[in-house]
Design a protein with these regions (language model features):
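Non-catalytic terminal/accessory segments
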Residues: 1-202
Length: 202
């Protein structure tokens, strides 16, 4: 059972997990009381109690409630999923709405720098893609990385094609530019259990 909440008077989003629903509801009630003592309150639209976790799918199936809810947090959508061997796995996917917004922003910028030299455009797009991957390249998010890079390449090709009606850019030529300037999609971050297991000398 997950409790997702955010105080309404300041930005402090948080996700808290509980094994039992009764514990989650009791905590939520105590949190409301505690914040009320300081004239604060939880955001009514961002605070919710959802059934999520290893046994959520099985319990909801028995009750005829369908799949477990998903939730968004820090730019990712969290989903109850399974590995290829059928084991439970929490999957993280880049938020689709955030990705679309980022692509729209890049489209506008590409149009503004349409007539700049291709190497200058390539360098800029390299840092755009690398920056996106540095945050989003987590396990279970490979498809989103591929999709982001592909959409960047498509928008870049459109800009390069439009800036000169005489020069047509075929996909073979475009592929050379893509391979030269756009970093390939690959997972950069370890699984959470591997990261949390790291110990540092004192």
């Amino acid at each position: 059972m997950n409790l997702e909440f955010a105080p309404s008077d300041f930005s402090c989003p948080c996700i808290i997990g509980f094994q039992h629903e009764s514990d989650a509801r009791r905590f939520l009630e105590e949190m409301r009381k505690r914040l009320g003592e300081f004239a604060l309150s939880l955001h009514p639209e961002k605070t919710r109690l959802i059934e999520f976790g290893r046994f959520a799918a099985e319990r909801r199936k028995r009750c005829g409630l369908g799949k477990p809810d998903i939730f968004n947090f820090l730019g990712f959508t969290f989903i109850c999923g399974k590995t290829r061997t059928g084991q439970f796995q929490i999957k993280r996917k880049s938020r689709a709405d955030r990705m679309r917004a980022k692509l729209r922003e890049i489209k506008v910028m590409l149009r503004r720098c349409m007539h700049q030299p291709i190497p200058d455009q390539g360098k800029w797009l390299y840092y755009v893609v690398r920056g996106y991957f540095n945050y989003h390249a987590v396990p279970t998010n490979s498809r989103a990385l591929v999709a982001f890079r592909t959409e960047i390449a498509r928008r870049w090709r459109r800009v390069l094609t439009r800036r000169s009606e005489r020069t047509k850019l075929n996909w073979k030529q475009m592929k050379q530019l893509i391979d030269t300037w756009l970093p390939p999609p690959r997972i950069l971050h370890p699984w959470p259990d591997k990261r949390f297991a790291v110990s540092h000398p004192r």
